[in-house]
């Protein structure tokens, strides 16, 4: 288990020319620095409703860029890919978004697609650098769109999973 970085040490992390994250390429102190930037975004979402409104979108984008860690199982992969699809192609309707975990609850037959090597050019560092809540929301949406574009070869699968969510996710327990 990795050691968490303190909030004060996160403030000192900025995208630099050293220590690229092996998953997304962010230059912010390697994988630990990248995670620290993301963890700070999560903390900020608790204090600002505008940031909180796009937090799930940020989680899905980050998870898909760090699929080896956050999308190990077919269910976790499906949750994040379908979540991104829901947000970007189905308006991010809360009732649909929260139907995804209900759809994945229990025995669901899924085959995990191959993890992509190219997962987008924007990273958590681009969002972290946003000045103010409005810029943050805009950057999260751009980041998610960039990751979605990188997953173009799996978009039809995500849409099929969304159709399954819509067809059967609401009544499942």
Segment roles from a protein language model:
Residues 1-173:
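Intrinsically disordered, low-complexity linkers and terminal regions
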